[in-house]
Amino acid sequence: RLWGSVAFVIGSALTGKLVSMFDYRVILALLTLGVASMLLGFLIRPTIQPQGASRQQESTGWSAWLALVRQNWRFLACVCLLQGAHAAYYGFSAIYWQAAGYSASAVGYLWSLGVVAEVIIFALSNKLFRRCSARDMLLISAICGVVRWGIMGATTALPWLIVVQILHCGTFTVCHLAAMRYIAARQGSEVIRLQAVYSAVAMGGSIAIMTVFAGFLYQYLGHGVFWVMALVALPAMFLRPKVVPSC
């Protein structure tokens, strides 16, 4: 995940610079280049195949999935709120900041700053959170979310935007690390199934749904949409799993 973040830093800074030099049509060219590169990457087969003992296939019917959700609903609700609260940021922060007078390149650098903070936390996570449970880390992420989205709704002053972007390491990275720690503590095939649900629901579904709502809210509330995102993150403080086994 760390190296994906490094690539994002380079890509966001480069895109902002190119948009400033040319126009927004360069985004389509970069997207096309990126998709073509991904296709070439998919065509390269790994030279070393994964090895391991075969495992007995466990039931993965609807009953197993429903049981998984019932057992982990607090965790799933918590991460959905925390990740879903990023929807307004992902969808409208660039528009919001440019309307406040920032250039496309400045917006690109701000986005890069957030992911630089993310990379640093990923790299130091073993040392920083060695004694923290997933429950503790989710609390940290929720607090960062309320603070970050509240600041975004209150000001567009550059010093505060720098703080906002540094807090990305708390709102996203710490939440993701907490999720990985929680999932890794499961047993057997539950790890795989819970990872799949987390990726589909928290990292995908919640952001998609919240982006739709954020669009309507941004149209009518403007910067007030970020205050709403702060309220979305707030309940996560109280929905954290009661007991989370340590890794």
Language model: regions and residue ranges:
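A late C-terminal transmembrane helix in Major Facilitator Superfamily
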Residues: 192-221
